[in-house]
Curated annotation (Swiss-Prot):
Upper classification of the organism: Bacteria, Pseudomonadati, Pseudomonadota, Gammaproteobacteria, Pasteurellales
Protein name per Swiss-Prot or TrEMBL: 2-dehydro-3-deoxyphosphooctonate aldolase
Compartments it resides in: Cytoplasm
UniProt-recorded Gene Ontology molecular function terms: 3-deoxy-8-phosphooctulonate synthase activity
Keyword Chaperone: no
InterPro entries: Aldolase_TIM, DAHP1/KDSA, KDO8P_synthase
GO biological process, one term: keto-3-deoxy-D-manno-octulosonic acid biosynthetic process
Domain of life: Bacteria
Organism this protein belongs to: Actinobacillus pleuropneumoniae (Haemophilus pleuropneumoniae)
Gene: kdsA
UniProt key word Cytoplasm: yes
Catalytic function, reaction form: D-arabinose 5-phosphate + phosphoenolpyruvate + H2O = 3-deoxy-alpha-D-manno-2-octulosonate-8-phosphate + phosphate
Keywords, sorted A to Z: Cytoplasm, Lipopolysaccharide biosynthesis, Transferase
Main location: cytoplasm
Amino acid sequence: MTILNKIVKVGNIEVANDKPFTLFGGMNVLESRDMAMRVCEQYVEVTNKLGVPYVFKASFDKANRSSIHSYRGPGMEEGLKIFQELKDTFGVSIITDVHEIYQCKPVAEVVDIIQLPAFLARQTDLVEAMARTGVVINVKKPQFLSPGQMGNIVEKIAECGNENVILCDRGTNFGYDNLVVDMLGFNIMKKVSKGCPVIFDVTHSLQCRDPFGAASGGRRDQVTELARSGMAIGLAGLFLEAHPDPNSAKCDGPSALPLSKLEAFVSQMKAIDDLVKSFEEIDTSR
């Protein structure tokens, strides 16, 4: 069965399941202005060299940290200043998450994509406020929700007048404190959303929690294998976090790619994407 492929425009980038993949990459949380500039510059250099469409990602507030003592970020006001400087300096589009209704309008005035966090994906008031900004929305699939249920969230956003939706898989609960990625789920999300672009958050899919700890562990030694598997499906994009020194990152370092490995990593992902999308589709439904 042929699946319709919708195109979502992000600046001059066309994001779609049958287009060359877009890299949504950056860092987990804004640690400082200088760190953000350094990371973004490296991503821009690599993606320009390889010819990969690119969107910078980072959070200004990690509002769902396990511990009240954990670093959350610089906050919305300072974060938006950093985002604007990145746009002015590098000409990048930007994606970031919102957690509160009041954040939607001011954030949407600066960034190009606002992200609906997985834990909040069914909160109707927040979904409605995000949708009414008119900007592109990236919906993280909740760890507790089946791929088929994502169609309901897309419909909710559409009912509020916004058709610019991207869906993102970031793993599914597998028992306690562990995640697994269902590779069949990507096509299910394509179908139930009537062709919305589907992307893969490989970084957060590698989380593995310490049941008694105050921070997430991770398995970055498996990031390449998992990302290769996802790219072989034929996706609209890959969501990736990198850090100059993952062991000292202020959030989710155990799942982050070392920044020094970025070019080799993205080069492999592009090779897989190019190959898969060169194939003629085989309809096995009949």
